[in-house]
Amino acid sequence: MDKPRHDMQHTLDELLFLAGDQLVAVCQERVAALLAQPEYADPRRLERFGFKGYSQQDEDGILQEIFRRIDLGSGENARRFVEIGVGDGLENNTLYLLQQGWRGLWIDADQDRCAAIRARFAAPLAAGTLQLTQAIVNAENINGLIAAAGIKGEIDLLSIDIDGNDYHVFEALDIPGALSPRVVVIEYNARFRPPVKLVQPYDALYSWDGSDYFGASLCALHDLARRKGYVLVATNLTGVNAFFVRKDLAGAHFYPDTDTAALFNPARYRLIPGFDNGHLPGYGPYLLK
């Protein structure tokens, strides 16, 4: 590259870097302004605890606070997770936990992403602290996939994010029979505010097209979770994920489950840069102290 072109590229890179920093700063200011509103002041609410470790937005912090309030399970399945829809492994709801000594199962449909996981996470896969299943998840196979991994009974966390059949997969799971998660995280479609109850029709071969046609409304998921023995404790500030805790564990630790509308957060996807943590995600071993 000749010098004028090199200088121009360097200037462009600097401008893009500054623009990125400014976007993050603006989003962080908007997040702070939102959290200063009275409805988020109740100490039982969870939005203000949100932060991004490896999650897409603020889920890592919300989960950390949930488990602080209810404690972790005990026995052989303590600190164990199942996450359905994990991307390339570097941005999901359980990598932050894996780094802290948790163990569990990742399930994803994408062949290339699973290949990247096998390469990048070779050590925990070899040690057995992480299992990976490549499969297109549907209502018919989900129980078999989890059983084949040897996971049953109580686990601490189940996370579902497959951009379509989330409701139907959650409905099909043998809960509280074969599996009993203490906490469930599931994506909701924030297009539909309470009291709307809508669910995308089941299609085992559905593939998300990138639009807002996906999943289920918060109220529909809330009703399903109640039938399975769970209470709604939070949604995240960006309006992406809903958090449920098994009813026998919730106690008075959380905002009342009786008002879905109060716990609903609308779609604020443009706030996502506000949870940027400054570096591209990577994976490597750490020493637990």
Pin down the residues of each PLM region.
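A broad, low-specificity signal for short, low-complexity segments enriched in glycine/proline
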Residues: 24-26, 37, 61-62, 144, ...
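Conserved acidic-Pro-Pro-aromatic motif
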Residues: 78, 83, 96, 102-103, ...
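Short hydrophobic/aromatic-rich motifs at helix boundaries and adjacent loops
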Residues: 31-37, 89, 191-195
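Short charge-dense sequence patches
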Residues: 5-18, 44, 60-65, 165-175
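Membrane-proximal basic amphipathic "stem/tether" segments
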Residues: 1-47
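SAM cofactor-binding core of SAM-dependent methyltransferases
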Residues: 47, 51-148, 153, 157-160, ...
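Generic signal for short, ordered secondary-structure residues
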Residues: 41-45, 76, 204
